[in-house]
Amino acid sequence: PCEVGKDAPAYILFTSGTTGRPKGVPVTFGNVEAFLEAFALLGISLLPEDRCLQMFDLTFDLSVGSYLPPLIAGACVYTVRLGSIKWQEVFRLMDDYRLTVTLMVPSVIHYLRPYLSELSAPDLRYSLFCGEALMVDDVVPWKQVASHATVWNVYGPTENTIYCTAYRVGSHDI
């Protein structure tokens, strides 16, 4: 195998362009390594038997956060089917495969809200939310579905390698 330095690009993603034109962001192997180290410091311990959700387009940086840590841990990654309605597919995957780890945008809860009484996620250990503001009004019904899950609110722009801030939502927050 060839040696790859920390400054070498691991991949390039484009920003959404909300502040102007989209721009390509080269993410280095050093950036990815730092993200994985920070992820481990959160205390989120992925196991080979975990079943993890990957709901994002591969052009979105959150997709990397959805598949890279699980694959490194030897866990399974379940993806939404191409062309599917994402919230319906999330419901199906959670129900069919008893997912243990999810990283989603909070709006998924809004779409699932009418069906939450039909969904039970007792195996869900970690539920991370990113990409939009996570409101208490979303967390309360979600915790009824996923009562054993630790909920995290994470955030970060593409330029900071997936996400760079994390807050563990506790019972005192809801």
Regions inferred by a protein language model and the residue ranges of each:
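Motif- and composition-driven signal specific to adenylation
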Residues: P1-I174
